[in-house]
UniProtKB/Swiss-Prot annotation:
<comment type="function">
    <text>Catalyzes the 2'-O-methylation at nucleotide C2498 in 23S rRNA.</text>
</comment>
<dbReference type="GO" id="GO:0032259">
    <property type="term" value="P:methylation"/>
</dbReference>
<dbReference type="Pfam" id="PF18125">
    <property type="entry name" value="RlmM_FDX"/>
</dbReference>
<comment type="subunit">
    <text>Monomer.</text>
</comment>
<dbReference type="InterPro" id="IPR002877">
    <property type="entry name" value="RNA_MeTrfase_FtsJ_dom"/>
</dbReference>
<dbReference type="InterPro" id="IPR048646">
    <property type="entry name" value="RlmM_THUMP-like"/>
</dbReference>
<dbReference type="Pfam" id="PF21239">
    <property type="entry name" value="RLMM_N"/>
</dbReference>
<feature type="binding site">
    <location>
        <position position="235"/>
    </location>
    <ligand>
        <name>S-adenosyl-L-methionine</name>
    </ligand>
</feature>
<feature type="binding site">
    <location>
        <position position="183"/>
    </location>
    <ligand>
        <name>S-adenosyl-L-methionine</name>
    </ligand>
</feature>
<keyword id="KW-0808">Transferase</keyword>
<comment type="similarity">
    <text>Belongs to the class I-like SAM-binding methyltransferase superfamily. RNA methyltransferase RlmE family. RlmM subfamily.</text>
</comment>
<keyword id="KW-0949">S-adenosyl-L-methionine</keyword>
<feature type="active site" description="Proton acceptor">
    <location>
        <position position="300"/>
    </location>
</feature>
<dbReference type="InterPro" id="IPR040739">
    <property type="entry name" value="RlmM_FDX"/>
</dbReference>
<feature type="binding site">
    <location>
        <position position="255"/>
    </location>
    <ligand>
        <name>S-adenosyl-L-methionine</name>
    </ligand>
</feature>
<keyword id="KW-0698">rRNA processing</keyword>
<dbReference type="Pfam" id="PF01728">
    <property type="entry name" value="FtsJ"/>
</dbReference>
Length: 349
């Protein structure tokens, strides 16, 4: 189990390689990263026994930016028939697991394998339980089987509390029919990723106040209104009429970069299409000056050196807050609903 498999958005394999290689170097885990363009995954091949396990134990998956999911393990070739027997034999050297996910890569080939995985899961689960390789009442790791085809699978494991919240890191969020744009799912996914579900009722409570910069037509505003948060929607464009009729939205026709609330708010959110450095500076200002307690801001990415640029901007935000003497948690993730962008979350401590 000396290979670390990392899922990602197609086209961002290079960013995953750069990110995991940097962490491995810091942790002194020898190895190398490799990936094929648009394959929706990357691999880190460890040069020493136990390297992949050390990486996963020393890193928090939630702190990684570009990987959607990860697992340590090995590739296994499967026959056309009796795949289960071959899998069971291979798993003899693996720990007993407490959950099972069958995964595919986020490619056209991967999507075509989804039906196979759905049909294969029930008989496989039954066989694993019968063979004592799966104990769903136990405390073992999660068994993650990533199928590249019906004949090739990556047999991996990961701790359930240190890996993706959803299979392949892809959330199953339903688009709310009342929301004025599909961008609404970005903010909902961000909340799932950055805020533990048990804290939603206190950190996203009814009666709180929020500002949505670049709000029109109101996709992100809708998420706050849906939780009965009072919103100042800032945009020169028109807002959705139903949102305005909710009584929870005040529309300010103003520039999102110059707008300031009359008093501090609980939340600031921003999905303005602008140079990432400008959005990062806006984020630092709002948290640094105490204009809000928490913020979610999207940073659009350049065409090249994307990981290096994100890292530079996060360091600039951290340095700026340190100079102000402000303590804050800083999180960053390329969410499933993000495209050429990442989502940053800051919380003033």
């Amino acid at each position: 189990m000396n290979t670390l498999l990392l899922h990602c958005r197609p086209g961002f394999e290079g960013e995953v390689c750069a990110e995991i290689s940097e962490h491995a170097a810091i942790l002194e885990v020898a190895g190398y990263a490799k990936a094929r363009p648009d394959s929706a995954c990357a691999e880190f091949i460890c040069s020493e026994p136990g390297g992949a396990e050390r990486l996963m134990r020393r890193l928090r998956f939630a702190d990684l930016i570009f990987p959607r999911q990860w697992a340590r393990g090995d590739y296994l070739q499967l026959p056309e028939t009796d795949r289960i027997s071959v899998l069971l034999a291979h798993l003899a050297d693996y720990p007993v697991c407490s959950s099972l996910w069958l995964e595919v890569l986020d490619t056209n080939d991967g999507k075509e394998l989804s039906n196979f995985c759905r049909k294969f899961e029930a008989p496989l689960r039954k066989a694993l339980v019968k063979a004592g390789r799966l104990d769903e009442q136990g405390k073992g790791p999660r068994l993650l089987l990533t199928f590249k085809s019906g004949r090739e699978v990556f047999v991996g494991i990961a701790e359930a509390n240190n890996s993706a919240l959803w299979p392949m890191g892809i959330p199953r969020l339903k688009f709310p029919r009342q929301a004025p744009s599909r961008s609404t799912l970005k903010l909902e996914e961000a909340w799932h990723h950055f805020i533990p579900r048990e804290q939603w009722d206190t950190r996203l409570a009814a009666g709180m106040t929020g500002v949505d910069l670049g709000a029109a037509p109101g996709g992100w505003t809708w998420q706050m209104v849906n939780r009965h948060i009072k919103v100042s929607a800032v945009d020169n464009g028109p807002m959705n009429a139903d949102l305005m009729d909710s009584g929870l939205v005040e529309h300010f026709r103003a520039d999102g970069f110059t707008f300031r609330p009359k008093r501090p708010v609980d939340w600031m959110v921003c999905d303005i299409v602008e140079k990432p450095a400008r959005n990062a500076a806006l984020l630092e200002t709002w948290i640094g000056e105490g204009l809000c307690r928490e913020a979610v801001v999207n940073l659009k990415l350049p065409m090249k050196q994307r990981y290096a640029e994100v890292k530079r901007l996060l360091e600039r935000i951290a340095d700026g807050l340190a100079e102000r003497g402000v303590k804050a948690s800083i999180g960053c993730k390329q969410l499933y609903h993000d495209r050429e962008e990442v989502t940053c979350h800051l919380r003033r401590l």
